[in-house]
């Protein structure tokens, strides 16, 4: 049986796969359904005790529960807004927007549950990189410039975070 923590990460990815394959007008509803299921699951897991042995590298500590709750509430608000916005702005396909938002939800969930620094870093950088297509949604000169600026600035952050992770890993090996 798959632990609940893994389902939290996999569920938005499954919704992203569904959103990839369906029509434009239905994608915002998939986004909203994923948000509501994630929020209800988050509320359930917030009140249910979980021991660290249940998940290994993935489990929710008390701080992770608070972070996951905040992520889920904010994503649900964004999903409600996206339904109306994407119905109004229907000139372009919303495939990348919906799929990237769901992949980002999955990665943010993984960030709140990761108990391994390497996994935490990968999840954090996945959230960063899945935001780039969202910045480029309008597909004009200003959005491409903003996307490139975002990627360049975030690449520096990714490199510094990785360097810090290496220093932290090295220092923990020296301590043992």
Named regions from a protein language model:
Residues 1-100:
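Transmembrane helix-loop-helix hairpins at membrane boundaries of multipass inner-membrane proteins
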């Amino acid at each position: 049986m798959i632990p609940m923590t893994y389902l939290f990460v996999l569920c938005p990815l499954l919704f992203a796969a569904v959103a990839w394959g369906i029509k434009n007008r239905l994608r915002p509803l998939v986004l909203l359904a994923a948000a509501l299921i994630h929020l209800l699951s988050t509320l359930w897991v917030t009140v249910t005790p979980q021991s660290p042995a249940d998940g290994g590298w993935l489990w929710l500590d008390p701080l992770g529960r608070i972070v996951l709750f905040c992520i889920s509430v904010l994503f649900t608000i964004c999903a409600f807004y996206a339904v109306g916005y994407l119905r109004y702005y229907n000139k372009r396909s919303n495939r990348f927007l919906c799929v990237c938002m769901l992949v980002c939800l999955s990665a943010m969930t993984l960030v709140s549950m990761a108990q391994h620094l390497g996994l935490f870093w990968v999840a954090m950088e996945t959230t960063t990189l899945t935001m780039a297509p969202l910045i480029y949604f309008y597909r004009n000169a200003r959005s491409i410039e903003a996307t490139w600026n975002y990627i360049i600035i975030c690449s520096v952050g990714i490199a510094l975070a990785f360097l810090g992770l290496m220093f932290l890993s090295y220092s923990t090996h020296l301590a043992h």
